Amino acid sequence: MMKFNSVVWRMLLRDWFLAIRRLGTAQVAVVIALASLALGCKTKSGAAPVSLFPESGEVAGWARSGEVRTFDAKSLWEYIDGDAERYIQAGVSKTLTSDYRYQDKVDGVADIYQMSAPVGAQKIFSTESATDSQPVQVGDEARLYKSSLVFRKGSYFVRLTAYEESSAVSKGLVELARGIESKLGRGGA
């Protein structure tokens, strides 16, 4: 095996710099841009991951506000300090959260907990109080409260919360839940 000493390294660097100088500015910019793209790719296909949250206007009356925030199991306490341990014990692998606004009046939040197995989502759902709730047809099992809705589907547990109570908001929560449910089978992130 050949060892490179400092003289050889200097010669290689000199040759590299001479080659770069022969290229035009535009060509160097293209090389740098292509290298940056190649280094920055995070998915195997190069495609952006599918969002589990409906975009603004996908569900009537709902507009997504802000960026999706992601928490792994280790950092979940930053989002739900005091209750994170319950989700960790149930096998949460990732939590996604996004803010929404309903009919440009009511703020809300959608939380999607991706569990390592469906039994984890079922465990969390079963610990949610059924008091003052009614069952609704969303996912594998769902409960609608005055200003919130929880449901589970496969390995996902979803919590929607609106910061106002009304029958219109309750109906809106069901529609948003169905919008999220339709995306859960797509394997997004």
Question: What feature does the model see in each segment?
Answer:
Residues 27-38:
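Bacterial N-terminal signal peptides
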